[in-house]
Amino acid sequence: MTANETQEQSLYQRLGGYDAIAAATDDLLGRLQGDPRIKDFWKGASADNRRKARQLIVDFMTEAAGGPAYYVGRDMKTSHEGMQISEADWAVFMEHSAATLDHFGVPAREREEVLGFFESLKGEIVEIA
């Protein structure tokens, strides 16, 4: 593969495709749901609810990265409205996101693209300064 072919690949392809995004999602959700600082966001969620949310995240990320998925969930603002997500909660999310990307050895370029994409969503998700 030439350097030009690498540059022409979508982020989805460069991340390793659907299975890689699904594995990273599982890792990230495990980190978030196990962190005492933010685990209460999942308090009371049934196993079915968690599975559905996980699949929506995988589809959202796959579509956003240029992959063959169609996200059918609500927009980020509506999905997170009323959750009272704070700047501190967001910082924990970003910390775990970076740790997940590092865990999977995601190269710097792709790591920055993913984290930059997450940052672009912050205004739709964080409700408390």
List PLM regions with ranges.
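Core of compact, soluble alpha-helical bundle domains
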Residues: 1-129
